[in-house]
Amino acid sequence: MLSDLRPSPLIDSATKNDSTSLKEIVQFDSAAIKAGIYPIEDFSGNSLEHFYAALKKINQKPVRIAFYGDSFIEGDIISDFLRDTLQHVYGGEGVGFVPLASEVSNFRKSIQHTFSNWSTYTLLSAEIPDIPLGISGYSYVPEEGNTVTYKPGKKPVQNKFKTVKILYQNKGTATLNYTINVGSEITKSLKRSDSVNQLLISSQAIHSISMRFSSTDDLTLFGVSFDDTLGLYVDNFSMRSNSGISLAKLSPYYLKQFNAYLDYKLIILQYGLNVALETDSTTYGWYIAKMTKIIRDLKASFPNANFLLLSVSDRGINENGKIITMNGIPVMRAVQREIARQSGIAFWDMYEAMGGKNSMSNYTGAKPPLAAKDYTHLNHKGGKIIGKKLAEALLYEINKHETKNNFP
């Protein structure tokens, strides 16, 4: 039985001490530590090769990153500032993939988004009609009177859209009616097919776009992407309460269709908060088995992408009036490192990058606060810190690779 699987000795040692010796696990980069960068661990020796190769040709073709996670990255937390930093280096105008409807749209700062009259289905929905789920784990069915409007975020580099891409499946006679800025409404028929399709709208200066869909009986929407012909893009695929295991429900058949349009070169996985328990005695062998299989299956669906697994963040609990790290956090961190090791993918220890033991208490108590009072979730200020740390770690590895391989 999966629950009877035993973790490796590394995981057992982590239950005794929340700071597993890095030298026991992987040859660590002391130069990065000295530079104030918490480095990425490479468990295959070439775990970011596809990503590096794509960056080498970024002047010819855009590079796209998928960032899957739970409520820790809701509202574009972390991914927003990862995107900003990497786009400053590699170019790119746009926030990437955005949902049709979102319960955290008012919280997100990287895009302004309003909507009405949509039915939403997710990997975690109790009942899903006979429709495919999108690459983000969400699908959207327009209801009577549906509308959705997008405006750029309030940052100088995000003051307009250039390209809008709508991903959908239309088995009927649906049409799109859209308005750019304050112009006249334009109507377009949506391609009829059982496959995933993309409709492209381009303009030099889109300051707002409003859409509504008609004749929608056999129409499913998956998302809207805001990007350009070149540059780097980061897509936030957050889902509240997701442990990561529900990714197994994503259909390889449809994932390959989405990837034909999006062509990911790096897929980041951030999970664990919905799995770690307050006890430190759980082995989590079942979780290792499930997640390694999921990563193996995702590799098959995204053959030209690399994978980067983030460890769980710190999480605080109240013990006798003092906020301390929850006992299960260091165990989950070691479990995730073992998942990365068995999967031969890259790993970034977000727990240590945050500051390690009791760091969430410090984030919440900072002036101004960097995290919420639940001692679990970062706010935008805290997300900016971690997003930049992750970007610095990636840029450090990219620079090291380029220096080693002697290309500009």
Q: What residue spans do the PLM features occupy?
A:
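Bacterial Sec-dependent N-terminal signal peptides
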Residues: 1-15, 19, 401-408
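Membrane/wall-proximal cationic-aromatic binding patches
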Residues: 12-67, 121, 127-138, 143
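Glycine-rich phosphate-binding "P-loop"
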Residues: 36-40, 175, 183-184
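Extracytoplasmic/secreted envelope proteins and their assembly/folding machinery
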Residues: 48, 52, 79-83, 288-295, ...
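A generic secondary-structure signal
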Residues: 54, 85, 256-258, 297-298, ...
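Conserved, compact domain cores that house catalytic/ligand-binding motifs in diverse enzymes
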Residues: 61-69, 74, 78, 231-323, ...
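Conserved SGNH/GDSL esterase-like catalytic core that processes O-acyl groups on lipids
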Residues: 74-181, 189-289, 377-378
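Catalytic His-Asp segment of secreted/periplasmic serine-dependent ester chemistry enzymes
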Residues: 251-253, 314-408
